[in-house]
A protein has these predicted regions:
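Charged C-terminal helix
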Residues: 155-184
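Short, charged, surface-exposed loops that flank catalytic or proteolytic processing sites
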Residues: 75-82, 149-159
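Short, small-residue alpha-helix embedded
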Residues: 68-69, 130-154
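Nucleotide and nucleotide-moiety/phosphate-recognizing core
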Residues: 19, 119, 155-156
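Conserved phosphate/ATP/ADP-binding segment of small-molecule kinases
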Residues: 43-119
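Short pre-catalytic strand/loop immediately N-terminal to key active-site residues, enriched for Gly-Thr
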Residues: 120-134
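Glycine-rich beta-alpha junction loops
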Residues: 6, 32-34, 66, 102-105, ...
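Glycine/small-residue-rich loop that forms an oxyanion/phosphate-binding "nest" at active or ligand-binding sites
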Residues: 2-55, 59-62
Length: 184
């Protein structure tokens, strides 16, 4: 499982390591955008993730802003656009993708969509307020990794991870008057 990879050199090293050791169950959490909508990575690192890691991963877990970048779309703000982005990401080489709609969609549900090139699985739960969600994306990709390590199929690992993160969000807590985090 990867997290934030801040340079193209680091992305190249991860790609070479995946190849060298013929790694399986590779979970890429692209971490290109945090709370806002602007890329926090230098452009060459983001482009390297797209070109070098997407084709090597078993699953990639972008939020909607990251998915728009990875799919070369101007924005991803609806369920239909999430599905379109998912198709493009898989067509670009990822074996599967789960796009985290979370709180970014204007619905009352936190919707994540899994796609493995064959079927879409929509996972919707009511949004949780207050939203102490710092670390939710990293927790989600780590929980998918744990499920795969325990022998679950990709779909089962994603579904279990969604339940785990939902519980962690329900018990989240404030860090200060601006942000709070998941509790797991």
């Amino acid at each position: 499982k990867t997290g934030m990879l801040g340079s193209s050199e680091l992305v190249e090293l991860v790609a070479a390591t995946i190849d060298k050791y013929d790694l399986h169950n590779v979970v890429i959490d692209p971490v290109m955008v945090c709370k806002g909508c602007d890329l926090i990575l230098v452009p060459d690192a983001a482009e390297s993730i797209k070109k070098l890691l997407m084709p090597r991963c078993d699953i990639i877990t972008p939020n909607t802003v990251e998915a728009a970048y990875l799919a070369d779309m101007p924005e991803v703000t609806t369920v239909e656009q999430i599905k379109e982005a998912a198709e493009k990401i898989v067509a670009a080489g990822a074996k599967s993708v789960v796009i985290k709609g979370g709180e970014r969609l204007s619905d009352n549900s936190a919707i994540d969509i899994f796609y493995d090139g064959k079927e879409f699985v929509e996972m919707a739960v009511p949004k949780i307020y207050p939203s102490y969600n710092h670390g939710a994306g990293c927790t989600f990709s780590a929980a998918i990794t744990a499920g795969l390590a325990n022998g679950l199929s990709m779909k089962e690992a994603v579904l279990q991870a969604k339940k785990f993160v939902t519980a962690a969000l329900k018990h989240g807590f404030a860090i200060n008057n601006i942000v709070g985090c998941t509790n797991h």
